[in-house]
A protein has these predicted regions:
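General structural signal for secondary-structure boundaries
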Residues: 54, 60, 112, 119-123, ...
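Active-site nucleophilic cysteine motif
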Residues: 100, 131-146
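Extracellular adhesion/carbohydrate-binding repeat motifs centered on closely spaced tryptophans
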Residues: 1-87, 91, 163-173, 177, ...
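Hydrophobic/aromatic-rich core segments of domains that either
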Residues: 140-199
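Secondary-structure boundary elements
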Residues: 80-127
Length: 199
């Protein structure tokens, strides 16, 4: 006697408005993988074209005008104007810190004492947009590039010895592991010597 075997059927539950089990994808109300920028709850996330969550990026180019800083858990924060300018320039420097330093050193020197009391954000934006500036601008542009690249960078405004007195000056310090390295773009551009001790 012939026996008939019923075909086994399995049903897969479609995921909607939720994360995949591995936390790498998010499905919308139609069960499709989300791509692009998506706000989920209180946080913003960025998903690649294949739907995978982008994670752990000091800066991530979403389009020509928008960059994000993305944490290890995928939470994204849109970069400010100056951070975006720094990210664009750093990419043009081949994502290379030494080339970024050389770019800041090569800015055409223009002293501007009227803005000497501004902050690193102002100086950097000035330098990225105008391609010139004084020691404050040279240091600030490099500082912003190092920062968006993920380095523990500090912009320092102080004084250096000049003649029998001292002169206002700015430079950058980067802490790597337990050591602090000094980077002085203006020193290199003015004296033609290596203006850093971090390489």
């Amino acid at each position: 006697e012939a026996q008939t075997v019923a075909a086994a059927t399995t049903t897969t539950k479609t995921l909607k408005n939720t994360w995949s089990k591995d936390g790498r994808y998010y499905y919308d109300q139609n069960g499709r993988k989300v791509t692009g920028v998506k706000k989920i709850g209180r946080y913003t996330y960025v998903f690649a074209k294949n739907g995978r969550l982008v994670t752990n990026r000091p800066y991530y180019r979403y389009n020509s005008r928008i960059y994000y800083k993305i944490a290890r858990n995928g939470r994204a924060t849109r970069l400010s104007t100056v951070e975006t300018l720094a990210a664009i320039r750093y990419q043009r420097c081949g994502n290379n810190l030494k080339k970024a330093f050389n770019w800041s050193s090569s800015l055409r020197y223009v002293a501007n004492y009227r803005v000497a009391r501004k902050n690193a954000t102002y100086y950097a934006q000035y330098g990225f947009q105008r391609g010139c500036g004084d020691c404050y601008v040279q240091a600030a542009t490099f500082y912003q590039m190092a920062k968006v690249a993920g380095y523990n960078a500090k912009y320092v405004s102080g004084y250096v010895a000049k003649g029998k007195g001292k002169a206002p000056h700015a430079w950058v310090e980067i802490k790597i592991r337990n050591r602090t390295y000094v980077y002085d773009p203006n020193f290199q551009s003015e004296y033609g010597k290596k203006g850093y001790n971090g390489y």
